[in-house]
Regions:
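Residues at the C-termini of beta-strands that transition into short coil/loop
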Residues: 7, 46, 76
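Conserved short hydrophobic interaction patches
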Residues: 27-30, 78
Length: 89
């Protein structure tokens, strides 16, 4: 699976605390191995082509699946999902 990172994701990721970056790397490894791993709690964002997975209790990753992989779109506190759900499809 190919992992693409949007410019927005890259910019936001750089500003994260090291602890969150470490948690993200761990969760990304799980995601690549098994997108349905229970600790990811991955699911669709209602009425959008986007999905999310859990980094930790507070942080989430928004992504969009493609045939050859996924595009990581954003990472941030849980309310980042609200921004993407308002965007719709």
């Amino acid at each position: 699976m190919k992992i693409y990172r949007s410019d927005r994701f890259k910019k936001t990721y750089k500003r994260l605390p090291d602890k969150v970056k470490n948690s993200f790397q761990k969760q990304l490894r799980l995601f690549v191995e098994n997108q349905k791993h229970p600790s990811l709690r991955a699911h669709e964002i209602v009425n959008t082509p986007y999905r999310e997975f859990r980094v930790d209790l507070q942080y989430r990753v928004v992504f969009r699946p493609y045939e050859d992989g996924v595009m990581l779109l954003d990472i941030g506190p849980h309310d980042v999902i609200d921004t993407w759900s308002r965007r719709g499809g």
